[in-house]
Amino acid sequence: MQPRIRLLQRRAVHFLVLIGWQAGVCRKEALMEYEGRICRGPMEAKAFMLPVTVGCPYNRCKFCDLFTDLKYRKISMEDIENELKRVSALGGNPSLIYLGDGNAFQLSTDELMEIIALVKRYFSNAHSFNSDATITSIKSKSDEELKTLHSLGYNKLYIGIENALPDVLNYMDKDHSVDEAYSEIKRLQDAGFSYAAHFMTGVAGSGRWEESAVAMAEFLTETKPENVVNFSMFLSADKLSEEIRNGNFKPATELENLKEERKLVELLDVEPAHPIKWDSFHDWIHVRTRGSLPKDKDKILSVLDKAIAKFDKLPDIYSMKMGTPENDDGYGFLGQESPSLKDVYIAPGAV
């Protein structure tokens, strides 16, 4: 039987927003103006998101088209202060601040210090600052700079690790190596920061789910992130789809992605004294696992086992957007009802 490919009419960025809507974390903020789409880790849902940059300064990863329509730039201190004034005048005084956009940590230490000072001037409750970061943005700061930022309340960075196989990172044009990820995260933690790891099942392509899981489990076990979020890879119609059409990349099926996650959770060696908050999305097939490791490990594995058993009986499914063919009704599968796993949707546990 020929594999059925889900054909998506939305941009991949919309997929990320759909993930966020399900988790209650990506939305238009009522009290702020924001270019593009808002996306952040689920655990930052209660934080006030303050835009300090627009887009991504790197913007070359093959798997990502989240920021391709945005030209990276810094938001002026004047505009940042005006936003703080506006929110403060409306009675806002948040304690948790999330600095946006795709890599706010790319700003210089002096710029970040100035922003933190501005926030504290208008929000007396503000005491904790988090943001997205890349390994290269961490590398750009000295040990002393990292310690200084942490002393001012900068506490956690969300880092796109994606995969722990060197050739995969190189092929996908990530701006760091596996060795750099190990060393820079250690420097970050030595300065007092915690970190959250973002990774993507399926990014290594078909047939590599097991070796990807083994490498990622080793990486996460050693680096001890506070949170782990899996945004199972969604194939866009831009850079990566061209590689697929040219035969240079064979995408993993959703079944392979589920097996990769299952193997990773199985292999993770998490100390009870240093638990990991786990959240994983296979949004296009409606599978999500969530919990605290190691406490909820068996529950999460049970959810994945049920999902694997169901999808093992179905034709191959790919989370893929390859244009807008006339015979696609917008729901994928060319008019056929798509399978879901609502009965095994979520593993109970702490978020």
Q: What kind of region is each of these model predictions?
A:
Residues 66-83, 87, 91-107, 122-140, ...:
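Core AdoMet radical
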Residues 115-126, 180-196, 254-269:
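Alpha-helix-loop-beta-strand connector modules within alpha/beta enzyme cores
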Residues 15-31:
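Short, Lys/Arg-enriched N-terminal segments with co-localized hydrophobic residues
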Residues 27-42, 221-351:
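Auxiliary Fe-S-binding modules of radical SAM enzymes
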Residues 136, 160, 164-168, 188-212, ...:
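Conserved strand-turn element in the central/C-terminal portion of the radical SAM core barrel
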Residues 3, 10, 22:
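Cationic, low-complexity basic patches in intrinsically disordered or flexible, solvent-exposed regions
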Residues 35-82:
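Canonical Radical SAM [4Fe-4S] cluster-binding loop centered on the CxxxCxxC motif
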